[in-house]
Amino acid sequence: MNKTAIKNYAVWARNELIERVTRKAYEYGVEKENIVADECAEIVNGRLLNDDEKKQRKELIKVINEKGFDQVIEEVAYTWFNRFIALRFMEVNNYMPQKVRVFTNSENEFKPQLLDEAITLDLEGVDKEKVYELIDTNQRDELYKMLLLAICNDMGNYLPGMFTTISDYTMLLFPDNLLKEDSVLGKLISDIDEDTWQDQVQAIGWMYQYYISEKHDQVVNILKGKVKKEDIPAATQLWTTDWVVRYMVDNSLGRYWIERNPESPLKEKLAYLATSKNNDLPIVNERVNPKDITFLEIKTRYLIQFNVA
């Protein structure tokens, strides 16, 4: 895995997405220091808004008034980065339930199969007449936007935690010109080898780590004092490498089981289990059924119960 390439891309992508999302906000008359026209305006910067855009713009202004411009732009930029990375990971590993590559073709060229199969795709929210119209008028960017948004919404049926239905201001701020070679998607394909994504979740973890690295360095600077509430994720949510996770699990849940089942063959598989010099562990005279174990994962606050046949 080329972590240098991942870092260079992720740091660049964050700044690029923030700039693109900021431009989209500007198109709808929303700037950091100024909001052009009131929240119910029908025409903004010479643009006639449809009903969805008016609703989304009104919500955007409301959220900005609550959270602040920079925070909202940062959140939207990360939302799109997160989804793009997840989709790339899934298409490379053939995990897409729609059985279509969203960014590349079968040769891993930046020629989305999604566009080639636009006519035959059966996705909720895709108007076939609109598809034909966009194809006939060669509006590839607009067609790609419609299809990509539909894919993201459809993915909500499979991964609702990551792909919540997009109908709010997040859609309004969807970045433009994604089919260009120097776009966030174009460079995602050209700068990160396809093999990188076959290293399972490691690639996603390092992408996140480097994406927030600049923000992390800013907010944890002790000279700036206390970390703000909205900056806590960037300051604390760092990628935990595979060996650290294995060490934690081996010496918590794994140790708990081996102490109560000293003859268990599982011990040979716990590569990071810490034992005494004699390779011994204390024996606890307590029989336990795996189904009865409830494990608290403190970092995510999940209670995990095991269902073992």
What feature does the model see in each segment?
Residues 1-309:
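Preference for the N-terminal adenyl/adenosyl cofactor-binding alpha/beta module
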